[in-house]
């Protein structure tokens, strides 16, 4: 009994830490251009998790952009519906954010985050974020 407990204590944290998300993107885009960000995940399958895009403009609160569900269906914030597309590639373990007609006000830190499908819990995993600056 004690041996199993010790193994659990030693291996459980590493399992948690191995579940990661990493955003990547161009850093800077010009007004009216399109933005494409990639979220690469590891340690879990996109067939079991919802992945969300969230952004935080400088000195402002977090803003929900949208989500891609396990089956590939999406929900996008009403204010961004005509500009945003979220897709994914389960095999590559990547989720993509496409945003058209970029404006200066779209300057923000962009994050991807995830929750296990079928749960109403908190955002389980977060990426470190990627800064996007819109400037001419």
Swiss-Prot record:
GO terms in the biological process aspect are: immunoglobulin mediated immune response
Which keywords appear in this protein's UniProt record, sorted alphabetically?
A: Adaptive immunity, Immunity, Immunoglobulin, Signal
Domain Ig-like stretches: 19-128
Q: Return the SMART domains for the record.
A: IG, IGv
Annotated GO MF terms: antigen binding
SUPFAM superfamilies per record: Immunoglobulin
Concerning InterPro entries, the annotation shows:
Ig-like_dom, Ig-like_dom_sf, Ig-like_fold, Ig_sub, Ig_V-set, IgHV
* CDD domains (UniProt xref): IgV_H
Record keyword Repressor present: no
Quote the cellular component terms of the Gene Ontology held in the record.
Answer: extracellular region; immunoglobulin complex
| Signal peptide bounds | 1-18
Q: What is this protein called?
A: Ig heavy chain V region XIG8
